[in-house]
């Protein structure tokens, strides 16, 4: 099937169904224009938006902006620019005084990004980006000098208020994304309205080849998993500075989505569970939206080494006596092109990521699943969950994988090179070929855009998010039975053609609050309760009690945009049991 024809059909189908079905994305009563109409310079509103606010921090003064209910301080540097000789090295704490720093700009600069794939796949990506407005599908321009923190707080907050802190880690497959995509104003407005004010912090970290370059040379240099180290230094900055903004450094909850959610788990297992800084814990709670453990091969495995070797070859460094130093010496554009010469997230390889956190014996001593199973992690109360149709978005890029044999070959060659063909075949066979059992779920014979799509979407979603979530929860309950956890399944976008309640749709509902419905209000309330009390049920109590997962293996089901239920966490149990029993072979 030609991609252009497929995309045209996808676009027509989505537009038709969304306009006709209240189960998809019903339009709110009023949506503001994306580009507001010009306002006369003398307008008092302009003066209000331009108001400045200052905060004295240990290394200087930060100047932010104040608008309505929220003060914003965007793009505060927490590390020296990772450029030149600092490229492909662990972050170096800011070595100079901050002085008076203007953080009143509109956004913080992004780190260098993975290119959107060329060819037919880019047509799909461009359409999805335009139609769905999912941040990690939106191309952005980055720069190497990008290690910054953004802080937002309720207007009028002052040092000593000791508000709890919500530390956001963006997603994007460890290849895309930036803190600037995630303004916390909507979250803070809701929290303020229900008397649960907090401090919102968003960290920038290096992605793709700049932040997660693998290879034996990288391991030997001690320069693996740099993006995770950037996040960790951001947390340390919070410990040192957030009190000046009115936050409590002892009440930090880390929250992420997709790769950001996986990063939250990785922060829990970093250094074998050592999350201390200056004798205190860097965070006391964790929220993970769509991502937990990703069993991975070592940073110097054959699979990982092939990525490094490709980058070296593309960068013209193959003949160098020190290939890593050669990469550091390349111009920005040349290194960017070399780093992006390997397959990306939005390509045929899809979730078989080129760049991701990998065990290195130090930062990640072992694969995250092993660290959790053996209790080598910072065990804190946590919420974790998934969207019902996590895999649909990523199953769009393999229209030729139409048979069981091709699916087995695809998974074994790109995902699970350590598994035998028999193991991969047995895994695939736990997923029926009947259309009614595939994803998007509960849609009968509908949405099979090409042969094998719904089955593959089910498998990809389970392997990377949905069922690994259950494996993680069980392992954590076994290792630390006294630490509470809560889990959820979100289906509030049921009826969205082809995609269902897809990966990233929680950003639209929960983070941005696109629609002021029950899904948005209840999830935010549960989360804000957790930020305050480490329990989603304590605080604002107008919603049903969310049962702890370990007590009953039950999920909070955000069933529709206007209804929540409690269900058993037992869907696709045969597949779950197989994945759990073969976790050692199913590593990426």
UniProtKB/Swiss-Prot annotation:
InterPro entries in the record: AB_hydrolase_fold, CarbesteraseB, Carboxylesterase_B_AS, Type-B_Carboxylest/Lipase
Q: PANTHER family per the record? A: CARBOXYLESTERASE (PTHR11559)
Q: What happens when the gene is disrupted?
A: Greatly reduces lipolytic activities at the early stage of incubation on minimal medium supplemented with either saturated or unsaturated lipid as the substrate. Also leads to growth deficiency on both liquid and solid minimal media supplemented with the saturated triglyceride tristearin as the sole carbon source. Does not affect pathogenicity.
For this protein, what is any one GO molecular function term? hydrolase activity
Specify the inducers: Expression is induced in planta during the fungal infection process. Expression is strongly induced in minimal medium supplemented with wheatgerm oil, but only weakly induced by olive oil and triolein. Within the promoter, a CCAAT box, a CreA binding site, and a fatty acid responsive element (FARE) are required for the basal expression of LIP1, glucose suppression and fatty acid induction, respectively. Expression is regulated by several transcription factors including MYT3, SAS, gzzc258 and gzzc066.
One of the protein's GO biological processes: lipid catabolic process
Instruction: Classify the main location.
Output: secreted
Q: Which N-terminal stretch is annotated as signal sequence?
A: 1-20
Q: Carbohydrate attachment sites?
A: 400
Q: Could you confirm whether the keyword Iron appears in this record?
A: no
What is annotated as the active site? 258
Which named protein is this? Secreted triacylglycerol lipase LIP1
Q: Which reaction does it catalyse?
A: a triacylglycerol + H2O = a diacylglycerol + a fatty acid + H(+)
Q: What does this protein do?
A: Secreted acylglycerol lipase required for efficient utilization of saturated triglyceride lipids. Is not involved in virulence.
Recorded GO cellular component terms are: extracellular region
Assigned protein family: Belongs to the type-B carboxylesterase/lipase family.
Pfam family membership, one: COesterase
Q: What is its EC number?
A: 3.1.1.3
Q: Which UniProt keywords apply?
A: Glycoprotein, Hydrolase, Lipid degradation, Lipid metabolism, Secreted, Signal
Name its cellular compartments. Secreted
């Amino acid at each position: 099937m030609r991609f252009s024809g497929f995309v045209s059909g996808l676009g027509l189908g989505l537009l038709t169904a969304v306009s006709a079905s209240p189960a998809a994305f019903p339009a709110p009563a009023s949506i503001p224009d994306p580009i507001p109409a010009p306002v006369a310079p003398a307008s008092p509103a302009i003066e209000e938006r331009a108001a400045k606010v200052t905060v004295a921090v240990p290394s200087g003064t930060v100047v932010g902006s104040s608008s309505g209910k929220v003060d914003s301080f965007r793009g505060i540097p927490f590390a020296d620019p990772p450029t030149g000789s600092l490229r492909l090295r662990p972050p170096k704490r800011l070595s100079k005084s901050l002085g008076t720093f203007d953080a009143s700009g509109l956004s913080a600069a992004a780190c260098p990004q993975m290119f959107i794939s060329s060819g037919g796949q880019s047509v799909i990506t461009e359409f999805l980006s335009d139609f769905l407005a999912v941040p990690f599908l939106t191309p952005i321009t980055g720069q190497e000098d990008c290690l910054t923190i953004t802080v937002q707080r309720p207007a009028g907050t002052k040092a000593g208020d000791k508000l709890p802190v919500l530390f956001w880690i963006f997603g994007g497959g460890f290849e895309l994304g930036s803190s600037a995509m995630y303004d916390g104003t909507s979250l803070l407005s809701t929290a303020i309205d229900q008397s649960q004010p907090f401090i919102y912090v968003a960290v920038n970290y290096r992605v793709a080849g700049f932040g997660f370059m693998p290879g034996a040379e990288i391991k030997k240099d001690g320069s693996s998993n740099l993006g995770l180290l950037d996040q960790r230094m951001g947390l340390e900055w919070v410990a040192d500075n957030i009190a000046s903004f009115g936050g409590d450094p002892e009440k930090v909850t880390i929250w992420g989505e997709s790769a950001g959610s996986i990063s939250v788990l990785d922060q829990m297992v970093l250094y074998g569970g050592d999350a201390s800084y200056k004798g205190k814990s860097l965070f006391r709670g964790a929220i993970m939206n769509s991502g937990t453990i990703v069993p991975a091969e070592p940073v110097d495995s054959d699979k990982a080494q092939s990525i490094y070797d490709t980058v070296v070859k593309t960068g013209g460094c193959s003949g160098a006596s020190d290939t890593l130093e050669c990469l550091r010496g390349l111009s920005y554009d040349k290194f960017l092109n070399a780093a992006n010469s390997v397959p990306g997230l939005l390509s045929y390889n899809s979730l078989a990521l080129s760049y991701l956190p990998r065990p290195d014996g130090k930062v990640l001593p072992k694969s995250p699943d092993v660290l959790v199973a053996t209790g080598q992690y910072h065990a804190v109360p946590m919420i974790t969950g998934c969207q019902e149709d996590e895999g649909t978005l990523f199953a769009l890029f393999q229209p030729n994988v139409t048979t069981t044999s091709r699916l087995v070959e695809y998974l074994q060659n790109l995902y699970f090179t350590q598994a035998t063909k028999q193991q991969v075949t047995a895994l695939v066979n736990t997923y029926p070929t009947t259309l009614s059992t595939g994803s998007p779920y509960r849609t009968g014979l509908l949405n099979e855009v090409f042969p094998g799509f719904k089955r593959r979407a089910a498998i990809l979603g389970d392997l990377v998010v949905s069922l690994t979530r259950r494996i993680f929860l069980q392992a954590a309950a076994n290792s630390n039975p006294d630490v509470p956890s809560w889990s959820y399944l979100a289906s509030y976008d049921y009826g969205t053609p082809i995609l269902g309640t897809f990966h990233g749709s929680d950003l639209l509902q929960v983070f941005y609050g696109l629609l002021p419905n029950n899904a948005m209000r209840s999830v935010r309330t549960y989360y804000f309760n957790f930020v305050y009390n480490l329990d989603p049920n304590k605080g604002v109590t107008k919603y049903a009690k969310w049962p702890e997962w370990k007590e009953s293996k039950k999920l909070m089901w955000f069933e529709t945009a206007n209804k929540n239920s409690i269900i058993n966490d037992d869907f696709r149990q045969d597949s779950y049991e197989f994945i759990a029993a073969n976790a050692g072979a199913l590593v990426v």
